[in-house]
């Protein structure tokens, strides 16, 4: 269902100058919550941007009726530190510092340099490039440096 929602609202969000990072539908305290997270290629995602996007996509979601039950719509930034789960997440996080944990228990910190549908390339501290297929990644998390 979230894939259909992404397809419906992704173009609308892009027409406003932002990028759709993720859509998730969760149940919290017996209430369905639809979370839409954004990336602003020109800077931060402000509260005004979240409100603007929410006001535009809310009626669209109501008309499409993808979610049968009542739900709360939450629109937010993708966050400074987040787990990368899909090729899209990797592509939208190029140039960021990440902590990488592999399925073979190896771990390292690097800069995410490239990503495609099968793998991601990481630049290590010695400037070497390490290419890893997604299937070999256990967890990749962006790191925010103060």
UniProtKB/Swiss-Prot annotation:
<dbReference type="Pfam" id="PF02576">
    <property type="entry name" value="RimP_N"/>
</dbReference>
<dbReference type="InterPro" id="IPR003728">
    <property type="entry name" value="Ribosome_maturation_RimP"/>
</dbReference>
<dbReference type="GO" id="GO:0000028">
    <property type="term" value="P:ribosomal small subunit assembly"/>
</dbReference>
<dbReference type="GO" id="GO:0005829">
    <property type="term" value="C:cytosol"/>
</dbReference>
<dbReference type="InterPro" id="IPR028998">
    <property type="entry name" value="RimP_C"/>
</dbReference>
<dbReference type="Pfam" id="PF17384">
    <property type="entry name" value="DUF150_C"/>
</dbReference>
<dbReference type="GO" id="GO:0006412">
    <property type="term" value="P:translation"/>
</dbReference>
<keyword id="KW-0963">Cytoplasm</keyword>
<protein>
    <recommendedName>
        <fullName>Ribosome maturation factor RimP</fullName>
    </recommendedName>
</protein>
<comment type="similarity">
    <text>Belongs to the RimP family.</text>
</comment>
<keyword id="KW-0690">Ribosome biogenesis</keyword>
<dbReference type="InterPro" id="IPR035956">
    <property type="entry name" value="RimP_N_sf"/>
</dbReference>
<comment type="function">
    <text>Required for maturation of 30S ribosomal subunits.</text>
</comment>
<dbReference type="InterPro" id="IPR028989">
    <property type="entry name" value="RimP_N"/>
</dbReference>
């Amino acid at each position: 269902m979230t894939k259909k929602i992404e397809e419906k609202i992704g173009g609308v969000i892009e027409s406003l100058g932002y990028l759709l990072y993720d859509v998730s539908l969760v149940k919290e305290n017996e209430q369905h919550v639809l979370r839409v997270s954004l990336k602003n290629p020109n800077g931060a995602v402000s509260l005004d941007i979240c409100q603007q996007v929410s006001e535009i996509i809310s009626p669209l979601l109501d008309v499409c009726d993808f979610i049968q039950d009542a739900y709360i719509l939450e629109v937010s930034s993708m966050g400074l530190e987040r787990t990368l789960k899909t090729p899209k997440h990797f592509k939208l996080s190029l140039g960021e510092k990440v902590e990488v944990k592999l399925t073979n228990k190896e771990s390292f910190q690097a800069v995410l340099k490239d990503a495609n549908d099968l793998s991601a390339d990481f630049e290590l501290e010695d400037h070497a490039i390490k290419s890893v297929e997604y299937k070999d990644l256990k967890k990749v998390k962006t790191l925010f440096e103060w």
